[in-house]
Amino acid sequence: PDLALSLVVPKEDGRTAALSSYQLEILRDKNKELNRRLHELSLNAQDNERLIRHIHALSLALLRTRRPDDVVNTLAACLKTDFESESVRVITFAAVYGVEEPWYSHIPADDARLKPFTDCLASNEPICGRLNPEKLPVLFGEAREFAQSIALIPIGGTGLIAVGSRDPHRFYPGMGTLFLRWIGELFEAALAQSRR
């Protein structure tokens, strides 16, 4: 089949020759498009495999934690190293003692600063893209250069994780959020387990 697609058919006069040349050209174009799509699927599969390996590593790391502060620190470290996140922000509704990092905040669920996140927290679905400016100070303070695109992961009744990037195209509306949801669920389960 590849040989047939690379053949050059001499042009002849007449309707039959013109039609066969036209059909051959259409088949070549379709073949190019299918090869392009196959290559794209292969790249997506490789990216997904890499993400699954990192989520597996995060799962194992969280299983090894014993205290709430270990859970929070482990999550942030894995997001920064394994997932190559430029900026991570973890907000919990209940205090986690022992975490004295600028990327961590304890903000009670009824605090007015969380009002801009009401819809996100209620839906419990990750959001990707650019955020409205009123949400940025709570998440990133003065470090807004990391807020060109953001993945926002609500954690049920536990809190909120924000991952920021300088790249305006890293997180975008419509991108898949399954892996982000898994990260949130792992964090929530590990934090609950460590508090028992």
Name every feature range the model reports, one short phrase each:
Residues 1-11:
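Short, positively charged
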Residues 15-61:
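Signal-transmission linkers at sensory-effector interfaces
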Residues 65-103:
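Helix-loop-beta substructure at the N-terminus of cytosolic sensory domains
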Residues 104-143, 148, 162:
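Regulatory sensory and allosteric helical modules in signal-transduction proteins
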Residues 147-155:
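A short, aliphatic-rich beta-strand micro-motif
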Residues 156, 160-167:
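A structured, mid-to-C-terminal "fold-capping" secondary-structure block
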Residues 165-181, 191-195:
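Regulatory loop-to-helix N-cap segments in sensory/regulatory domains
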